[in-house]
Amino acid sequence: MFCKKGPLSRGAMCLAVLALALGVCWVSQATASVNLPLHHWAYEAIERLTALGIIDRAMIATKPYSRKEAARYVARALDRVRKDQVAADGREAVAAPLLERLTREFRPELMDVDAVIRAPGESLRGIRYGGRVTTEMDAFFVGGGQTVRFRENRGGEYYVNGENNQTDVRGWLELGDWLSVTLQPKFISNRHVLGIGATNNSLNFYLREGNVKISHFNVALEIGRGTQWWGQGYHGSLLLTDHAYPLDMIKLGSEQPFKIPWLEGLGDWKINSFLTRLEVNRDFPRAKLFGMRISYQPTDWFEIAATRLTQFGGRNSPSQQFPNAIWCNYSQTQGQNQGGKCQTNEQGMVDFLARIPRVPYLVPFPAGVQLYGEFGLEDRVDHPAALAGIYIPQVFPGDSLDFRFEFADTDLERQLTGGANTWYNNGIYDSGMRYKGFPLGHHMGTDGLDFFIRTTERLTDKLTVGANLNYQERARGLPVHEKKREASADMTLMINDRTQFTLSYVFQRIENPGQITSIDPFAETFAAGVTAYNNLLWTTLSIQF
């Protein structure tokens, strides 16, 4: 179907698809492994080791990735340390404890790739399993008469006035190297944690995540519920984050990065795709969403990726079904948002990450800096959005202080041309690129600005503290829009290898706070003249077994 005789552009597309497909399957070893949940501490640890140059090559912007992929990155670092390829120049103050903790976390996977020595009597197991219990105690005060406030990057959750408890159990099972299963039920003591009003929720128990993954020849097929984060952003990403409720998906992609046969010198590639069905309560009930992401790392210090989301179908929609609707839009050359069978809502994005080494006087930091960015389009080239950031993994030699600054803008079009209300919206699909009212991408939503700063410091081998500052404006194209000033602090204590305790506090001052008042069509109402002072305190205890 995809390689019928046609224009040159179609032939080039087919050739590219065939080359990438061959590369995906060129990795002969099947490596099915459970995914690390988003916001697992290992993601930040691996990113920091990569930014420090301890891990010399890693594709880390597409999440989740598996425990075995994480172990391969850790194995690269261990190998470089053993070969004395990492200079003792002060980076070890940060890298050594991180690498030690990662080695303990992924010891079974590291034994499988011969990166650590297997202890006597410790054999390779055909069935592997594990679990984690997490309980959170909340004490929230949401001011301004609002009672709730959306919680950023938390799977469709809200801060809710009063004391609440959230507890989940995450269990996983791996069978050989071809099958993995994950299940994560969750309890919330207050149903409004998952919605109120237009987004109302009536459940105290729900399935946070549950999926089955089959892998063979580096091709991974995953079916079930889960969350994804596609992009370089830390505080948010333009197209796909875990801000909205978890999606029920079919995912297909490469289990690990690969090289194209006979063109290995070009670098590493990775492909991810998914298909999901959205909720009933929207413009076109049960509309579909297809996403594809191609990541490319030509060299150790640079990574680039392209992402495209296509919303189509749904009850009473004239558009074709999958895969014809996708091919109809991918192959056309006359722009998007065509009527009839090609009727869709689309977003596209290109993102990059570059690691800049230390340069005396210009880049004075011991391990240099990471620069990253995203540039997105909503349906057309005249609907842009952008995100840019800088990450310094070690500010001072021999110290563990890091620093991050990130800026995101979905209000570019209004500032440049006066056009407003485009990002995450659509003239046909008027519930927009959202799920249960929440944007699939950045939590600031339409016509937003977001400035974010974070720094962390490891005080002891077991205790780390962090602080954030955030200024955000939402819906700047409306006469009344929201302005938020936020400061927060957190403390994480590793009680032992399997037990972690976190204490977090957030203060928010929000002018004209907004609440979702309709999903079909989407509408958000801002309380003019109201200033909400929110005090948000919570503790989290996580135990692995």
Predicted regions and their residues:
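Bacterial N-terminal signal peptides
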Residues: 14-25
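Short loop/turn motifs that connect adjacent beta-strands in outer-membrane beta-barrel proteins
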Residues: 59-61, 83-97, 116-129, 173-181, ...
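Surface-exposed loop and membrane-interface regions of Gram-negative outer-membrane beta-barrel proteins
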Residues: 159-163, 181-216, 231-241
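N-terminal secretory signal peptides that target proteins for export/translocation
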Residues: 1-10
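N-terminal periplasmic/intermembrane-space "pro-region" immediately following the signal or transit peptide
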Residues: 29-159
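Signature for the C-terminal beta-barrel architecture of outer-membrane proteins
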Residues: 178, 229, 249-430, 446-453, ...
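Outer-membrane beta-barrel "beta-signal"
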Residues: 294, 493, 531-545
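Extracellular loop and loop/strand-boundary signature of outer-membrane beta-barrel proteins
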Residues: 154-157, 194-199, 235-240, 278-280, ...
